[in-house]
Amino acid sequence: MSDRRPIATLPDLLISQIAAGEVIERPASVLKEILENAIDAGARAIEVRLEGGGIRRIAVTDDGSGIPPEELPLALTRHATSKIRSLDELESVASMGFRGEALASIASVADLTIISRTRGAEHAWQIDGGSLQVSPASGPPGTTIDVRQLFDRVPARRKFLRSEATEFGHCVDAMERIALAHPEVAFRLFHHDRAQRQWLPADHGQRIRDVLGAEFVGHVLPVQAAAGAIALMGMVTRPTAARARADRQYLYVNGRFVRDRTVSHALRSAYADVLHGDRQPAYVLYLDIDPGAVDVNVHPAKHEVRFRDSGAVHRFVSQVVGQTLAQTGGAEAVPAGVPDGAAPDAAYAGEPAAAAPGLAEPRAPYPAAYPSPGQSPYQGSPARPHTQVPFRLHGEPAGIPATDWQSLYRPLPGDAAPAATALRAAPATPLPTADEHPLGQALAQLHGIYILAQNSRGLVLVDMHAAHERVVYEQLKRALDDRALPRQDLLVPVVFHAAEKDVALVEEHETQLNELGFEMRPSGPASIAVRSVPALLARGDIESLARAVLRDLGAVGVSRLLTEQRNELLSTMACHGSVRANRRLTLEEMNALLRQMEITERADQCNHGRPTWVQWSVNDLDKLFLRGQ
């Protein structure tokens, strides 16, 4: 056994290097900390110059308030800051930085120089991070922080850096995240004295377009809602524009980029019915909440936050985004005022350039019931009548009682009358105009699978089974949502061993569990008894179901597991209760299905996230046949 070493105070330099290990991972970490300081200083224009991907040099110049010469040494002292003075200020902090560790940590692992000039000062002053000597310098009002030779003093850290190109890419990512959060600030980025990025001051919508591109904005839906002290705004992609990777997901809480599992879970819940396979949504969302209701001091790099009431945040985000995605079928087919020759992106997105600036407008109050947020980007489109004849096959009854939801998936009748699809004389189908139904009028059926329809833009092709599946699925969900969740009492309670924290969760969330159809009670210090469960799920594994619900409650303060399992059952029922392939439909039945799609939420995708229809404009068809070329 080795001799015991006495306890000793660590040198200040080593303390700063240890702190740097938590905060400074790579050049992008340095850039993030300096940019946040510039934002806190009130900068309206920031210039960044990099060399070697930020490994050899990071120089950030801003036009903020500057630092007086007598405070420059304090700026490089650990735990010295102008942001907070008390615990109360920490608990409601609104600035990006507040710990006073960043500059001291950077100076301990790199060569650092600060040149700063306050407004009204005769000249600038500079300080060297090594000697801490302050001397006169030249420079405009504002601050320049110059960092060179990152990790030269800590070779063990430097060997973990990647190539210069990779590190430069991370620096660009860090700058984009901050630029998206602060559209009022102008940014310029240079690498080896070559201009790489430039973003002028703009509103949120224009900044998103500038940073992420017109293609991204061309496939998004605007989000804007508020309820009490919480508000959400931004953009979410349509389900059809989901990505293979989760690489374009930007969440800001009070202007700070974070990764939060509560909001991530809420967004997955909102997209649950409309994403195909393992596709990932893209979004830029700004969540504003009372600073006292969120703790930002939970992660060394401030990448995570903790909400005081995570369940309320989850419900708000999930319902707002869910309502945004729940547009009726065909909303993208005929946007108002889009000429036939319009670019596909413009026609698809409903003029995103006009919708994006609306993100900067003041938020309207959002009722507690969370109706559809804001106005649709298609608000100029004529209202669609909601008095259509429901889609029915021959022999199907004319109506379904609202309480008889089981009849929605009754077995289909026998062969329906075949549609007249052969080439023969038939009445000419008038060309629909833009003020008629977005999905147009049915023309024929193809291979017993697809419906061909004509609208004012061109040709619409509908997968009739996928479309009818979504219609039936939404009817089933509405029928169950309108009634209390039935509960089934167990003859013999299911008792299982549980951790003490799970027993505490049962007591804490008793009301919420009852609303979900559960009756759970602690049956001892380390066991839980389940006495009743939702009737729809009574035949499942009760213990596994209860544990999964408690796991959700412990993680995000809310559980959508029962809703997801219920919807999975309804999806299967809808699939088996929908019109099958090779079933011949009449034109009247085809048109009835199109009309129901137009008044059904999420009808652009089936229950499994596959598209239910596609649109070809006349221009698209002309290109196939080389017309006009």
From Swiss-Prot:
SMART domains: DNA_mis_repair (SM01340), MutL_C (SM00853). GO terms for molecular function: ATP binding; ATP hydrolysis activity; ATP-dependent DNA damage sensor activity; mismatched DNA binding. Residues 371-382 have a biased composition (Low complexity). Keywords: DNA damage, DNA repair. CDD domains: HATPase_MutL-MLH-PMS-like, MutL_Trans_MutL. Pfam families: DNA_mis_repair, HATPase_c_3, MutL_C. GO terms for biological process: mismatch repair. The keyword Ribosomal protein does not apply. Residues 364-388 are annotated as: Disordered. PROSITE patterns: DNA_MISMATCH_REPAIR_1. NCBIfam families: mutl (TIGR00585), PRK00095.1-2 (NF000949). Belongs to the DNA mismatch repair MutL/HexB family. This is DNA mismatch repair protein MutL. It comes from Bordetella bronchiseptica (strain ATCC BAA-588 / NCTC 13252 / RB50). The gene is mutL.
